[in-house]
Amino acid sequence: MAPDAGEGWGGLSTGHVVSRSVRDSALMLDCTAGPEPGDPYAAPMQEGSFLEAIARPPRQLRIALMLKDHRGARLHPECLAAVQRAAKLCDSLGHIVEEADPELDMVALRPLSARISAANTARSCNMRWKALGREPNADDVESVTWAVYQHGLKVSGVEYIEAIAAAHAAGRKMARFLTGYDVILSTTLAGPPPRLGYFDQNGDVQTFTERVTEYLSVTPLHNATGTPAISVPLHWTADGLPVGVHFAGRYGEEATLLTLAAELETAQPWFDRVPAL
């Protein structure tokens, strides 16, 4: 699960956990949610605990079903099967599911988000090298990290603010869309899990960038808009690999996502499913 966007990478990145149960995600969020004294930004606080929230019966939700990838193209067959299966399960549990799309230009957002992450990567690397008392050195990091670092050094202040403004505009459009829906259901990634080594951070930088850009598909949209989101494994390929489905909700409504995920976990348990090695 990824909670509301906070301060990391200009708001694009928020740390949480990869867990095997909704209970663990809820409990960890109870342990970490809320601002520290002096934080310049803060997400809305949850009334009560997230662990208590997942124990309550979920209310009926209006769910927008996205059946296209970030380019507006048809999904990979496994991903399409995953979201359709999840939609049927949600419908069987009493939720209202209909095909709808916030119609945000995810392709145009990519290079703008890349500016933000590159500039923040450059700052993080410089801080680390300073703490170590060393000069920036390509041998200290992966080739991809070094390329992103170099890009970040060249991002101007105006370019950075333009990118932040674009993310904020996308967030406002997403918020307007979510006045009509509680949750957006989409694929998590563009395809089934790739083989180890497919994303080689010490390989060709252009190849890595192209592969990551295509594989992440719709999830970077929610990094930009700040909407909380959660992925759950409701579909498995014939050879036993999990294909995630992705639920995104309104700003400040992590409890809605966790409650829905808990309901899905009860209806279709995944805890004991482990891919064959």
PLM ranges: what are they?
Residues Y41-M45, P111-I116, E162, P194-L216:
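Short, surface-exposed loop/helix-turn segments at secondary-structure junctions
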Residues E52-L67, I116-A175, T187-G191, P228-L234, ...:
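Short helix-loop capping/hinge segments that flank enzyme active sites or metal/cofactor-binding pockets
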Residues M1-A81, R85, M127, T259, ...:
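A short helix-breaking turn/cap at a secondary-structure junction
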Residues M1-G15, M66-D69, A118-A119, T188-T207:
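Short glycine/serine-rich loop/turn segments
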Residues D182-I184:
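Short, Asp-centered acidic motifs that coordinate Mg2+ and/or phosphate
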Residues S13-R20, Q150-V155, F247-A248:
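Short, well-ordered beta-strand elements within core beta-sheets of diverse protein domains
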Residues V17, L241-R250, L257-L258:
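Short, well-ordered beta-strand elements
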Residues L221-A224:
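Conserved short alpha-helical elements in the N-terminal third of ANL/AMP-binding
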